[in-house]
Structures are given as structure tokens and as C-alpha cells.
């Protein structure tokens, strides 16, 4: 089942649509702006492509042998392209034209209904998207480098005098020798459950006298302690003590000293 339908345009409209399609297909692959000259040069180089034709289709020129291709005249110089990256204006949909409207200058030409297709809007949207990809819009966000430091206002009440040259930077002061610091004592971990049961006390190591000697009374001296005291009195030639906690007394040692410091100050 064939889905082909007859075209909706007349002969001039079909010719203009075909001419416009040639221009657009050429502009998609080349930017010289002259598709006729380009096709002529390609035809001189490669010739007319051969291939099977449908039954009853006439050959080029009414016979099967193609005629010799003539070189086209050089067209007039193309106008200067407009400023910016806009493509050159195509020869249709202009601001004015002849009365017949064959060039598409007026909206009342034979291809007036072609402008209602929205093809121009589609092509303009594609051009805008391509231009946006080629030239991305600059972002206003400032990128700070690693070495950049924030400038702060000086606290000095003096202001720089106008017209004076830049002042020389003062010499850097020698760095003071850092004093050694004590090692930081690690803090005890805080309980993660403050509402729970209180923390248990740490177990004590050793007897009570080692931990709190001032708060506990000392034990009474034994017979062995007194025997050691009398032995030391015999050896050191001193009298015994009444209490073992008292300091010992040595009678042969002087307890009053007369010290004279002779300092030769001038």
C-alpha cells in the first residue's frame, strides 16, 4: 500500500521549494554561499552519477547519453558577511521583491503558505542552540584561587595621601623562638548516657597507707622497731628518742653556726 500523496503546491511553488532545499542542504555542509557554482564544480569532477531509472523515465536531454556539462559563469562577488556569527542571508523571505513573488520577497507570492510551516522558527532555534554550545555564557560566580586572601580594611586611622607613590613594605620582624609547650593531658571521656547509672569508681591498688598517708593514723611501733632504734643509738653515739616519729639528736653536732660572707664589692 503506497502512502504517496500528490503535493499541495503548484509548479512555481514546487520549484521554489526545491531550490530552497538545495540551498539549505548545501549550507548544512559548506559555507561558501554559492551552491550552484559548488554543484557545477562537483559535476565537472565526478560527472553525472549513473544508476537505474524507472521505466518510462526520460534520460538527460531526452536521450540516454548525457550532454556535456558547461562551466557556469562566475557570479558577482558576494556581499560582506554581517557582523557576529550570524549566517549569511538566504535569497528568500526578503523584505521586498518583484510583483510576481517568485523570489519570495513578498508574503503574497506563490509560496506564501510555506512561511506558515514554522520552518524558519525551527531553523532559528537550531542556530541559537548551536551558537549557545559554541559560545557558552560566562558565569558571574567568581572562582577564588588557593593563594588569594581576603582583604580586610586597615584599622589605622591614617589614610593614604593622594598622589604619593607606593610605600616600601617594612622589613619582616624576626620570628620569635617558640617555647616548648607541655604535653596536653587527654581529657576524660564524657559519659554518653548522662541519665543512666553513675560511673563506678576505679579499683584501688595497694594498701590504704599508700594512697592517703595523711588521713590514716600510723601504726604503733613494734618491738623490732625499738630494737633497731637502740642499735642505731649505739652505732651513732646518740641518745634514744622517746618517739620514733621525732627527729634524732646528735650532741656532737653544732646547732649554732656563725657564717660570714666576704663579698668584695666595689
From Swiss-Prot:
It comes from the Viruses. Pfam families: TT_ORF2-like (PF02957). Transmembrane segments: none annotated. Residues 94-108 have a biased composition (Gly residues). Signal peptide: none annotated. Residues 78-90 have a biased composition (Pro residues). Residues 129-161 have a biased composition (Basic and acidic residues). Residues 166-176 have a biased composition (Low complexity). Residues 50-116, 128-224 are annotated as: Disordered. InterPro entries: HEV_TT_vir_Orf2/Gyrovir_Vp2_N (IPR004118). This is Uncharacterized ORF2/4 protein. The lineage of its organism: Viruses, Viruses incertae sedis, Anelloviridae, Torque teno virus.
Amino acid at each position: 500500500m503506497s502512502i504517496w500523496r500528490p503535493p499541495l503546491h503548484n509548479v512555481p511553488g514546487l520549484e521554489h521549494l526545491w531550490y530552497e532545499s538545495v540551498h539549505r542542504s548545501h549550507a548544512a555542509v559548506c559555507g561558501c554561499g554559492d551552491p550552484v557554482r559548488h554543484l557545477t564544480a562537483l559535476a565537472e569532477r565526478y560527472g553525472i552519477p549513473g544508476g537505474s531509472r524507472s521505466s518510462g523515465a526520460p534520460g538527460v536531454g531526452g536521450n540516454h547519453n548525457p550532454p556535456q556539462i558547461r562551466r557556469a559563469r562566475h557570479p558577482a562577488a558576494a556581499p560582506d558577511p554581517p557582523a557576529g556569527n550570524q549566517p549569511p542571508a538566504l535569497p528568500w523571505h526578503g523584505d521586498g521583491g518583484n510583483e510576481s513573488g517568485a523570489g519570495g520577497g513578498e508574503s503574497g507570492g506563490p509560496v506564501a503558505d510555506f512561511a506558515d510551516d514554522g520552518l524558519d522558527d525551527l531553523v532559528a532555534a537550531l542556530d541559537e542552540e548551536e551558537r549557545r554550545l559554541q559560545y557558552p555564557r560566562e558565569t558571574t560566580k567568581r572562582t577564588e584561587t588557593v593563594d588569594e586572601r581576603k582583604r580586610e580594611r586597615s584599622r589605622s586611622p591614617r589614610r593614604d595621601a593622594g598622589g604619593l607613590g607606593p610605600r616600601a613594605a617594612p622589613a619582616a620582624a624576626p620570628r620569635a623562638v617558640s617555647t616548648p609547650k607541655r604535653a596536653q593531658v587527654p581529657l576524660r571521656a564524657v559519659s554518653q548516657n548522662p541519665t543512666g547509672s553513675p560511673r563506678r569508681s576505679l579499683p584501688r591498688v595497694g594498701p590504704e597507707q599508700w594512697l592517703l598517708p595523711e588521713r590514716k593514723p600510723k601504726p604503733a611501733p613494734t618491738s623490732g622497731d625499738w630494737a633497731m632504734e637502740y642499735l642505731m643509738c649505739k652505732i651513732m653515739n646518740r641518745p634514744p628518742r622517746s618517739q620514733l616519729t621525732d627527729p634524732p639528736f646528735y650532741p656532737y653536732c653544732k646547732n649554732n653556726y656563725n657564717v660570714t660572707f666576704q663579698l668584695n664589692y666595689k
